[in-house]
A protein has these predicted regions:
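PEST-like, low-complexity acidic/proline-rich intrinsically disordered segments
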Residues: 1-16
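Cyclin-like alpha-helical protein-protein interaction core
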Residues: 12, 25-27, 31-110, 116-266
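Eukaryote-biased recognition of C-terminal alpha-helical segments
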Residues: 267-284
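Hydrophobic alpha-helical targeting segments used for export or membrane insertion
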Residues: 1, 110-111
Length: 284
């Protein structure tokens, strides 16, 4: 019998940076997934803004304690959001469900992290003793309940049909960064990779605020919904924000990058620039 690896003890130097090697895996028919994801986002009438900001920060915090790689961190965020969407579709009282998730958020996060970790590597588990220790240390008002955790884990797996959502946003950011920043020799690879992960955490945590800041300029709600649902555009804006924080203020370089990314995303360059500025503004 193979020994299971406790993910909380696994951590490598590359876990804290973007995967900027040439074998990232986002090269075969890669835009189809994003087109499909955009259409699903447009069709989803269930807003998750009341739950996801706090959930995103909690996932990032617990991933740091468990020393989980960022690929699991960002995929866990997307998987939790998918869980919320799928449940709201079927739940007769969505407000009650939202309250239940918020009240028991640490348990939901642990359940999601456990599922995503196993899907990334079937031999890995989260150390149960460490789960209890971390939750009690970070959420002292939370009463530890193994039965409740087991019930939530079962509910999560059943609702998601044992499927997780790999982070399309992370994949696109890695691809665009390799093609549009590293090839220009603007900054060191390790610096760009570390900066990219930090910016992605901000984008995930502040996504609702970032898009809300653009609403005063919106003339067509349907087009804005499509814009918000497109992870390629968000990835492009994130990469141009990385470029900006690399002190690459040369207007010609920035314009060339935005123009090329706009062709990949099938969007006007100014829309990428507006979204980039919104990202930068939530940081400043």
């Amino acid at each position: 019998m193979e020994k299971q690896t406790t993910l909380a003890t696994v951590n490598s130097p590359t876990d804290t940076v973007l995967n900027l090697s040439t074998d990232s895996g986002f090269y075969t028919d890669w835009k189809y997934e994003y087109q499909l994801d955009t259409e699903q986002g447009i069709a989803n009438p269930y807003p998750t803004d009341t739950i996801m900001p706090a959930a995103t920060r909690m996932i990032s915090t617990l991933c740091a304690f468990f020393k989980l790689p960022h690929s699991i961190e960002f995929s866990a965020i997307d998987t939790l959001e998918q869980l919320v969407i799928e449940t709201l579709k079927k739940d007769a009282s969505p407000d009650k469900f939202a309250e239940n998730v918020v009240e028991n958020l640490p348990f939901y996060v642990i359940a999601i992290l456990s599922l995503v970790s196993k899907c990334f590597n079937a031999r890995t588990i989260l150390d149960p003793a460490l789960q209890k220790q971390i939750l009690q240390a970070n959420f002292p008002d939370l009463e530890w309940n193994e039965q409740k955790l087991a019930t939530i884990e079962f509910k999560v797996m059943k609702t998601l049909n044992y499927k997780v959502s790999q982070s399309l946003l992370l994949g696109a950011v890695e691809r665009f960064t390799k093609e549009d920043i590293l090839t220009r020799g603007i900054a060191r690879k390790d610096f760009v990779g570390s900066l990219g992960i930090k910016l992605l955490r901000v984008v995930y945590a502040q996504k609702s605020q970032i898009y809300a800041s653009l609403k005063p300029n919106v003339k067509c709600q349907d087009l804005f919904t499509r814009f918000k649902s497109n992870k390629l555009i968000l990835a492009a804006a994130t990469v141009t924000a990385i470029l900006k924080f690399c002190a690459a203020d040369e207007e010609l370089v920035a314009d060339n990058v935005v123009k090329r990314l706009s062709n990949d995303c099938f969007v006007e360059p100014k829309n990428i620039t507006l979204l980039r500025d919104a990202i930068v503004n939530v940081i400043r």
